[in-house]
């Protein structure tokens, strides 16, 4: 009976310790998967790093320049999709859509659905890169 209690107790403790790690890898607590927001603006910077990269975009909201933060994947994921600091240089006009932040008053998004240049050419749709001309 003592060994059984030990095994059950150990399983409970390990399960409790794993929960935060599992929760971290879900964007749902921070971004609303039931909604999509689309912004159009100019890239100010792209930070490619692990575990998450960030794209910053200046957007005109009622005559005011407001910076949006777009959470992206790892550096390796971006590289596989041909997204580099050269692809999204500061000053590049883009349109991007994704899941909006749940934080009140926040200007952020993640889980990109589309990322396009101002001329409408696709840079990225979801996680599938598009060839030029598509």
Labelled PLM ranges:
Residues 41-43:
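Conserved hydrophobic positions within beta-strands
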Residues 1-11:
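Bacterial N-terminal signal peptides that target proteins for export
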Residues 49-59:
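Short aromatic-glycine-enriched beta-strand elements
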Residues 80-96:
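Short nucleic-acid-contacting surface segments enriched for D/E, G, S/T with interspersed K/R
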Residues 101-127:
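OB-fold/S1-family single-stranded nucleic acid-binding modules
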Residues 9-20:
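Bacterial N-terminal signal peptides
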Residues 22-37:
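Short boundary/loop segments of OB/S1/cold-shock single-stranded nucleic-acid-binding domains
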Residues 72-80:
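Short, structured beta-strand/loop micro-motifs enriched in basic residues and often containing a Trp
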């Amino acid at each position: 009976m003592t060994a059984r209690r030990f095994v059950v107790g150990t399983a409970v403790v390990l399960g409790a310790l794993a929960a935060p790690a599992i929760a971290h890898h879900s964007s749902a607590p921070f971004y609303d998967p039931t909604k999509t927001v689309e912004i159009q603006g100019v890239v100010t910077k792209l930070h490619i790093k692990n575990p998450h990269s960030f794209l910053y975009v200046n957007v005109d909201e009622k005559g005011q320049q407001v910076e949006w933060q777009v959470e992206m994947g790892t550096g390796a994921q971006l590289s596989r999709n041909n997204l580099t600091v050269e692809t999204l240089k500061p000053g590049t006009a883009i349109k991007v859509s994704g899941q909006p932040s749940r934080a009140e008053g926040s200007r952020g998004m993640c889980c990109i659905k589309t990322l396009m240049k101002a001329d409408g050419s696709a840079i990225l749709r979801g996680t599938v890169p598009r060839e030029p001309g598509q």
